[in-house]
A protein has these predicted regions:
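Extracellular calcium-associated, cysteine-rich motifs in secreted modular proteins
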Residues: 1-178
């Protein structure tokens, strides 16, 4: 901004005639000085998506719909606002999980763990759901099925949180455990 001469073509300068140089829906002034919201986030007025997470800065700064009071915003300077290893863009558009909560479904497993540790199914390609605490709806939460391994000769076998009846014996997992 300091080395910008009026009328000069310079990709590093904000526009003198356009209040939103990068076209992200937030004025250059709000991006530089911070929009008056809970977090007062700033972002680069020359970058449509400062953190390269797939969400434009204007959306991240103004779309504050997370948290108990729907007043939490994703951070336009951090592609993973909650630090769960899933980008904000993927949480919103791919997994429908909360980019401001590391464990959206409160089942004791982080969203990142649920979508990256896909160890179920014949090809070990099935994951638990980051938005359903009981992915198979069998009455046992995913964390209980994963961490309470009480079957087999050495009590080291677990029920599958993706299957209603892991051993296919006609008795559901919840009934067998209870």
């Amino acid at each position: 901004i300091n080395n910008c001469a009026y009328g000069e073509e310079n990709d590093e300068c904000t526009s003198l005639v356009n209040q939103d140089s990068d076209g992200d829906g937030t004025s250059d002034g709000d991006e530089v000085y911070g929009l008056n919201n809970t977090y007062n986030y700033t972002s680069d007025p020359m970058e449509w998506d400062t953190d390269n997470d797939g969400l434009n800065d204007g959306l991240e700064i103004t779309n504050c719909v997370y948290g108990e009071d729907d007043d939490e915003c994703t951070d336009p300077n951090n592609e993973d606002s909650d630090g769960d290893t899933i980008s904000d863009d993927n949480e919103i558009y791919s997994y429908y999980s909360n980019p401001m909560d590391t464990d959206t479904d409160d089942d004791g497993l982080s969203d990142g763990t649920e979508v990256t540790n896909c160890i179920y199914g014949e090809n070990d390609n099935l994951c638990t759901s980051p938005i359903a605490p009981d992915s198979d709806y069998d009455g046992l939460s995913d964390d209980i099925e994963i961490f309470n391994c009480i079957y087999g000769e050495d009590n080291d076998e677990c029920t599958d949180p993706r299957e209603l009846d892991t051993d296919n014996d006609g008795v559901g997992d919840e009934d067998e455990i209870n």
